[in-house]
Design a protein with these regions (language model features):
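Beta-sheet-rich non-transmembrane sensory/scaffold domains
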Residues: 1-357
Length: 357
């Protein structure tokens, strides 16, 4: 991703640094800060300074994994958001299940916030884990979701930076290494999963893709915990400490199923569900609105986030095939004098512009 600071002094790029498919090359994941006023001088930041904290960060949910995994090459920056005062940037590390905080003026990475995991066995978090059950059936399951946010947007509210993330999820799947496994292909701990044979049926958990890199802390022959990709939600995080402020739980999929009949793609239930991918914020009148693009549902969910601790669902908007990028244009910059939402959809190659009322 490439973006710029509000004061126009800096351009920032997220340089993901994905490995070659054979892992013979795995470049550093970095963020570049380009100083416009200094003749476009480039300062590139990596994450090697946090290598000594790897164990502590992993205990909180950071992921470092893969062939010959080193901390700095493992970090994969994805999307960036910048504070209105142009002093701070936050970067999603999607595969690593974390957000990094950057001081723009000192050109340094100051924090990495691991995001932890979402428990699908709690009320309100139920998911449909199967694409072979001939229905859309949400149920509580003994699985945890890795948030793994893709897009990120920032809102300053009551003097506090709040980070909105679209928790799409992502898989490392290359010719030399693939982390994803279906639950039916894993050995499950008989004490934790006494009903493993039933759980492994295709219509239950058998088809659900999970990571093989987590869930076996004792390194024996079976898995004690299961972790799937993404959280099928959008979340709000405290930008100062990375603490979770709000999560939409399973509301995106519940609303998709209830309001947009025939839109929910049950064929994606075994992967990442509706795959919230894009998110943008903006004032419509006096209300702060969040727009959440769901790639696999071909929808944008619209929320009133004037109180970001208690977002309120408004409606879903049917878009093109696989909405990818979302851009909000405030009314004062709009040629129609009304706020606009621009949605780019990757599968049908369209860009659509919606005018708010």
């Amino acid at each position: 991703m490439i973006t710029y600071s509000y004061d126009g002094k800096y351009i920032l790029t997220a340089n993901e640094g994905e490995p070659a498919t054979d892992y013979l090359a795995d470049p550093l994941g970095t963020v570049s800060i380009i100083s416009v006023k200094d003749n476009y001088t480039v300062t590139t930041l990596d994450f090697s300074g946090f290598a000594s904290q790897q164990t502590a960060l992993q205990a909180k949910g950071l992921r470092v994994f893969g062939p010959n995994a080193s901390f700095a090459t493992n970090m994969e920056p994805e999307y960036i958001t910048i504070s209105p005062d142009s002093r701070t940037a936050w970067v999603t590390l999607q595969e690593n299940n974390a957000i990094a905080k950057i001081d723009i003026r000192s050109k340094s990475v100051t924090h990495i916030f691991p995001l932890g995991f979402k428990d699908y066995n709690l009320n309100g978090n139920a998911i449909d884990p199967s694409d072979k059950d001939n229905t859309i059936l949400q149920k509580k399951v003994k699985v945890k979701g890795m948030y793994q946010p893709d897009a990120i947007a920032m809102l300053e509210q009551w003097g506090k930076p709040l980070l909105f993330t679209a928790n799409e999820g992502d898989v490392r799947e290359w010719s030399a290494f693939a982390e994803n496994k279906r639950i039916k292909d894993l050995a499950l701990d008989p004490t934790v999963f006494p009903d493993a044979a039933t759980l492994k049926l295709d219509e239950n958990l058998g088809r659900l893709n999970v990571t093989s890199t987590l869930g076996n802390p004792d390194n024996d022959a079976d898995y004690d915990q299961l972790y799937s990709f993404g959280a099928r939600s959008f979340s709000v995080w405290n930008g100062l400490n990375g603490q979770l402020v709000y999560d939409s739980k399973n509301e995106l999929e519940t609303k998709t199923k209830a309001i947009a009949a025939g839109v929910y793609d049950d064929g994606r239930s075994d992967d990442k569900g509706v795959e919230p991918e894009g998110i943008t914020l903006g004032y419509v009148g006096k209300r702060m609105i969040a727009f959440v693009g769901m790639e696999r549902a071909d929808l944008v969910a619209i929320y009133d986030v004037s109180d970001p601790y208690h977002p309120a669902f408004i409606k879903t908007l049917v878009t093109g095939d696989a909405p990818e990028g979302l851009l909000f244009i405030p009314a004062k910059y709009s040629p129609t004098n009304k706020s606009l939402l621009v949605v780019s959809s990757e599968n049908d190659g369209t860009v659509k512009v919606y005018q708010t009322n």
